[in-house]
């Protein structure tokens, strides 16, 4: 076979019989695998399995398979949420704003805590207050973090009657401070130290006057008193007593040998009021951001945010997403990668990728990498800091910016794919699905406002308005639309036979076009067998349009029955 004919048969996926060598070509079009769309590629240059339109179908079996319809309404919220979260059992949390939520990293947390940022200030809630009553949940929350006391203890040495300091060398100099403790056992940073206290006679009691706990919503119910102890040339603060928060007076007569552990929460500050983007890394470290500052909590203590655990980026941060013990930080400029086994060892580096993040809600963790909506397409970043424009080969920058409105993307990972709801230029919502393995996209005709992926049951629940349903959770198949590439033949050809392989051909609709003119249109219910005779038609550019509710495994066009491939 001449090289030109062989090359043409590969490029145009037309199988030529040996008679082609003698100048008699008998081609056929045989589509044996089906995939999604690659809008960047000219339709006639697409791979034979690609489509120019793929809607409400998937290709997990390598063929056209209808997605199931969305399920019926499973739950109706009292608000129109922008964020939902499955707390446990039948309890669903919903917020009218974009909210970032994490579960408590504490092992077997008896309180059932979750932590979240909602754009107002960081919060924590627990089962005892979140699920009370009826209506929208969570029913209540506390401000995240424990504030430091603002007033120092007032100290008075209680000298006994007639007691004298006979040995000035045993005088003890002390300072006192206190911390607040929440009902969950979370201890905050210490307040200011007291004035110097000199105890001339050993074990002389010291009377402490404490200030009331300020009005707050941090769930503070206790306070801890510490006093300084010198030893080895260094001073430390050791625990004297733990008191109810309402106690305003205490007498310290505890011998030094009976003091408790040293103060360990010096820098356990509450997170900043404007922190958002809360997420949890694999090593128990929570992360968030505010402006161009990314911050990390102490490990397994999401209420404690030391200032030394903060880092800055050149541009304002748009979104953050954990990958194992690393954190991908997408900004209005280049992305960053922060890594470390503990908060104090975390360091960051800028990733050389000129792709700003255009949508905070577009950033999701896939399997081993993160995807977010960049300037020119979806950007992929892995835990090693390797960045790439994931959709470069299938969507052009112009198509991305004009057709997909990246600033509007709200995305979720499900079944290894990137499910993105966005607003089209005409204001209507649409959904596209990016398959990183297949490197194609497809569309779904079920737009939504927000969603939540249930990994245990492999269900993606979506909310439209106030109603929650399961994506592809219905019993009936969706109406598919799949349009093949345009097969450009070397010369005008007349195909006379159409074969459609399907387990349910009666549920499949087929339209064949020649040079954009319909040759045959078979609505669902018209096919009773697999082979159909085509009306006489000649064309150079052929295309097949699939519709209906049935799976399609193979589509073949041939010039005669005898030329149909096995």
Task: Label each residue range with its predicted role.
Residues 5, 10-11, 15-118, 203-205, ...:
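Beta-sheet repeat architectures centered on beta-propellers
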Residues 8, 14-55, 59, 75, ...:
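Disordered, low-complexity "stalk" and linker segments at domain junctions of extracellular
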Residues 110, 117-120, 174, 282-283, ...:
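Short loop/turn segments that connect beta-strands within the blades of beta-propeller domains
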Residues 121-128, 292-299, 333-339, 376-382, ...:
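Structural motif
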Residues 129-133, 181-185, 230-232, 340-344, ...:
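Short loop/turn segments immediately following beta-strands, especially the blade-tip
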Residues 265-268, 304-311, 347-353, 398, ...:
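A short beta-strand motif characteristic of beta-propeller blades
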Residues 278, 320, 363, 451-453:
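Hydrophobic core register within WD40 beta-propeller blades
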Residues 327-352:
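Surface-exposed extracellular loop regions of Gram-negative outer-membrane beta-barrel proteins
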């Amino acid at each position: 076979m001449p090289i030109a004919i062989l090359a043409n048969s590969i490029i145009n996926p037309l199988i030529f019989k040996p008679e082609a060598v003698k100048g008699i070509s008998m081609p056929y079009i045989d589509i044996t695998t089906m995939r999604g769309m690659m809008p960047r590629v000219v339709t006639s240059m697409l791979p034979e399995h690609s489509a120019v339109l793929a809607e409400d179908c998937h290709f997990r079996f390598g063929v056209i398979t209808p997605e199931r319809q969305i399920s019926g309404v499973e739950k109706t919220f009292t608000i129109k949420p922008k964020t939902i979260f499955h707390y446990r059992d039948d309890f669903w949390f919903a917020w009218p704003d974009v909210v970032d939520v994490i579960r408590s990293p504490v092992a077997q947390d008896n309180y059932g805590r979750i932590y979240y940022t909602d754009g107002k200030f960081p919060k924590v809630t627990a089962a005892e207050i979140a699920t009370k009553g009826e209506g929208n949940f969570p029913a209540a929350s506390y401000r995240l973090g424990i504030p430091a006391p603002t007033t120092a203890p007032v100290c008075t040495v209680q000298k006994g009657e007639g007691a004298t300091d006979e040995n000035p060398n045993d005088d003890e100099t002390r300072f006192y401070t206190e911390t607040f403790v929440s009902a969950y056992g979370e201890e905050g940073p210490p307040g200011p130290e007291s004035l110097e206290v000199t105890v001339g006679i050993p074990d002389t009691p010291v009377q402490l006057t404490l200030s009331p706990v300020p009005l707050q919503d941090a769930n503070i119910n206790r306070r801890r008193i510490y006093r300084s102890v010198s030893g080895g040339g260094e001073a430390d603060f050791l625990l004297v007593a733990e008191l109810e928060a309402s106690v305003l007076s205490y007498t310290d007569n505890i011998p030094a040998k009976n003091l408790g552990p040293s103060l360990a929460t010096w820098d356990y500050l509450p997170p900043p009021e404007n922190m958002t983007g809360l997420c949890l890394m694999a090593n128990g470290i929570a992360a968030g951001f505010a402006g161009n500052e990314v911050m990390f909590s102490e490990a397994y203590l999401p209420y404690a945010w030391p200032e030394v655990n903060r880092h800055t980026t050149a541009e304002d941060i748009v979104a953050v997403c954990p990958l194992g013990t690393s954190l991908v930080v997408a900004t209005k400029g280049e992305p960053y990668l922060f890594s470390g086994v503990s908060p104090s060892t975390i360091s960051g580096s800028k990733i050389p990728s000129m792709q700003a993040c255009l949508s905070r809600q577009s950033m999701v963790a896939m399997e081993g990498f993160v995807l977010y909506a960049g300037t020119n397409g979806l950007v992929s970043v892995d835990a090693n800091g390797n960045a790439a424009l994931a959709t470069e080969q299938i969507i052009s920058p112009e198509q991305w910016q004009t057709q997909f409105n990246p600033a509007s993307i709200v995305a979720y990972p499900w079944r290894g794919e990137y499910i993105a709801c966005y607003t089209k230029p005409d204001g209507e919502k649409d959904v596209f699905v990016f398959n990183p393995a297949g490197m194609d996209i497809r569309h779904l005709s079920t737009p939504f406002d927000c969603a939540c992926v249930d990994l245990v049951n492999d269900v993606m629940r979506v909310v439209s308005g106030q109603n929650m349903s399961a994506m592809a959770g219905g019993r009936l198949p969706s109406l598919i639309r799949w349009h093949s590439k345009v097969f450009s033949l070397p010369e005008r050809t007349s195909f006379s036979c159409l074969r459609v392989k399907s387990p349910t051909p009666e549920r499949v609709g087929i339209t064949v076009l020649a040079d954009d003119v319909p040759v045959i249109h078979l609505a669902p219910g018209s096919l009773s067998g697999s082979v159909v005779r085509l009306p006489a038609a000649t064309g150079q550019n052929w295309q097949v349009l699939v519709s209906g509710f049935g799976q399609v495994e193979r589509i073949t066009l041939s010039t005669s029955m005898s030329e149909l491939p096995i």
